[in-house]
């Protein structure tokens, strides 16, 4: 989508109330989009609405609910769809997980991406639309202290690639791309895991420029508007986007 076309376009962001989702919603709003932010907790959504004004619409809903994706796509007809919602994994080694805690990210992260990508293809979204899913760098290297998290994030990358292939096959003109952010102490979830891995390895918490929600927001906006960013998957670090094949 050319940069001038984002002005007035509807962008729907799941998991918009905190962390990366909040940064993404803010960046898209500042770029001129009309942003629909979806999250279960309405209070932080309303706080974001107070910050962003009329360019932001707060929707309190469970993004993993099988009925929500179709309802909101029909209601708002987004041109930009950012699938960021996810559960917080428990920081413990595999032997201390139950299947319920181990599979938490499959039940939330993967299920929500499945429902929304399915509805984006079935609706379908308008030609020229962009669907961005938030996977994780853990999908490349694993994450032994977070149960099924890494596998769930790898599944999200696969689902996104499958959807891209279906869009091409059906000539729908919908772009699907996955983003794999590195672990960062700049979010509440990331800070817990950075500290946990440092303690496990008996090292200090790594220093250096972190991947902040603001940087993530700018990267997602660049993916939507930037010429040349046409790959199907990108690793995202504090240094920026890097294609993954």
At which residue positions do the language-model features occur?
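Catalytic Tyr-X3-Lys loop
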Residues: 95-114, 132, 156
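Conserved glycine-rich Rossmann-like NAD(P)H-binding loop of the short-chain dehydrogenase/reductase
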Residues: 31-47
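C-terminal helical subdomain
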Residues: 174, 178, 196-245
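Conserved mid-core segment of classical short-chain dehydrogenase/reductases
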Residues: 86-103, 145-148
């Amino acid at each position: 989508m050319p940069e001038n076309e984002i002005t007035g376009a509807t962008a729907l962001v799941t998991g918009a109330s905190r962390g990366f989702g909040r940064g993404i919603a803010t960046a898209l709003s500042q770029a001129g989009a009309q942003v629909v932010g979806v999250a279960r907790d309405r209070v932080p959504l309303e706080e974001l609405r107070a910050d962003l004004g009329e360019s932001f619409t707060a929707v309190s809903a469970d993004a993993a609910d099988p009925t929500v994706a179709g309802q909101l796509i029909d209601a708002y007809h987004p041109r930009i769809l950012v699938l960021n919602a996810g559960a917080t994994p428990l920081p413990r080694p595999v032997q201390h997980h139950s299947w319920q805690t181990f599979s938490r990210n499959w039940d939330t992260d993967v299920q929500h991406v499945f429902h929304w990508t399915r509805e984006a293809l079935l609706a379908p979204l308008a030609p020229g639309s962009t669907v961005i899913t938030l996977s994780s760098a853990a999908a490349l290297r694993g994450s032994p202290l977070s149960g099924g998290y890494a596998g769930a994030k790898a599944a999200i990358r696969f689902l996104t690639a499958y959807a891209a292939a279906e869009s091409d096959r059906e000539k729908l003109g919908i772009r699907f791309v996955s983003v794999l952010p590195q672990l960062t102490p700049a979010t509440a979830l990331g800070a817990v895991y950075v500290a946990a891995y440092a303690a496990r390895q008996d090292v200090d918490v790594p220093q250096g420029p972190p991947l902040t929600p603001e940087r993530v927001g700018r990267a997602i906006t660049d993916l939507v508007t930037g010429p040349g960013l046409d790959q199907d998957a990108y690793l995202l670090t504090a240094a920026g986007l890097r294609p993954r094949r």
